[in-house]
Design a protein with these regions (language model features):
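Hydrophobic cores of alpha-helical transmembrane segments in multi-pass inner/ER membrane proteins
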Residues: 3-4, 80-92, 172-179, 240
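Interfacial transmembrane-helix boundary/kink motif in multi-pass membrane proteins
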Residues: 18-26, 34, 68-76, 99-124
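Alpha-helical transmembrane segments
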Residues: 27-41, 114-118, 200-206
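Alpha-helical transmembrane segments of multi-pass membrane proteins
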Residues: 34-56, 123-127, 131
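Interfacial helix-start motif at the membrane-water boundary
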Residues: 63-86
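Juxtamembrane helix-loop-helix connectors linking adjacent transmembrane helices
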Residues: 95-166, 182-191
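Transmembrane helix-loop-helix hairpins at the membrane interface
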Residues: 155-260
């Protein structure tokens, strides 16, 4: 009887885990998880990141603004458009999958916990590389300004800029770049899906490294490449929501460690 009950409990746990792993990769659940981050960043753009010199943001967001500019949308008009685009993309994705408009209330909270846990190895990696390189500053994964300038920001500005990096850098380097590369390699080039994913992750990590000006230093360059591989692996295995959460949490922790 005891063995039967234990077996039943194990089966229920495995079924619950499988349900969570699947649900957390669905676009509607990802939207529910990311919507508070999108709103927080938009509020940050309006208040915490605005000064007499303009609005401080990350390079990925600036790239998106330049893309909007090609369609005649000015930087001022497109500044808050990125968040809307991300929401629309997830909603369209949900409609195309034809999944029901139903959410498990606990799933977004569990995704936050998972994101925090998955961030820990990246923090350990950063500290190991930091101790063995010439640099002495924590390494945020967002190239906004130099570390000294990041350290001078208010806590709310640091929080907003970190969230923005998670949203827009993962949108650019993981959701868009990996998807495009995988389509070209697998659907067009007829490569094996796993091999195509690996190549896409490596290329994305290389682009992510070049994107960071600090990567000119050997130690920093190594970190950003490995971090790009890590983010790419998380994206492929656990989806867009979790990788955004990991990136944002990592940056929040690293930026908060910078000296004022």
């Amino acid at each position: 009887m005891t063995r039967t009950r234990a077996s039943g409990a194990t089966g229920e746990s495995q079924a619950w885990l499988a349900t969570y792993l699947g649900a957390s990769k669905k676009p509607l659940t990802i939207l529910a998880f990311l919507l508070p981050l999108v709103v927080a960043y938009e509020i940050g753009l309006a208040f915490a990141l605005r000064s007499s010199q303009g609005v401080l943001t990350n390079k990925a967001h600036v790239t998106l603004l330049r893309f909007f500019d090609t369609f005649g949308i000015s930087a001022g008009g497109g500044l808050y458009l990125g968040g809307a685009v991300l929401v629309v993309v997830l909603l369209v994705w949900h409609v195309l999958t034809r999944d029901p408009w139903r959410l498990e209330p606990a799933t977004p909270g569990l995704m936050a916990v998972e994101s925090l846990m998955v961030t820990i190895p990246l923090i350990v990696l950063a500290q190991v590389i930091l101790r063995n390189s010439a640099g002495s500053q924590p390494m945020p994964a967002t190239p906004v300004v130099d570390p000294a300038a990041l350290g001078s920001l208010t806590i709310w500005s640091k929080l907003a800029i970190s969230i923005g990096a998670g949203l827009y850098e993962e949108l650019m380097f993981r959701m868009l770049l990996i998807a495009v590369l995988h389509t070209l390699l697998v659907d067009v080039g007829k490569l094996n899906s796993t091999l195509g994913a690996v190549i896409a992750i490596v290329v994305s990590a290389s682009a992510f490294t070049i994107y960071h000006p600090q990567a000119a230093d050997l130690g920093s360059g190594l970190f950003y490449f490995v971090a790009g591989l890590y983010f790419g692996g998380v994206y492929v295995v656990r989806g867009f929501g979790i990788v955004v959460g990991v990136h944002a949490i990592y940056d929040i922790i690293m930026v908060s460690m910078l000296p004022s």
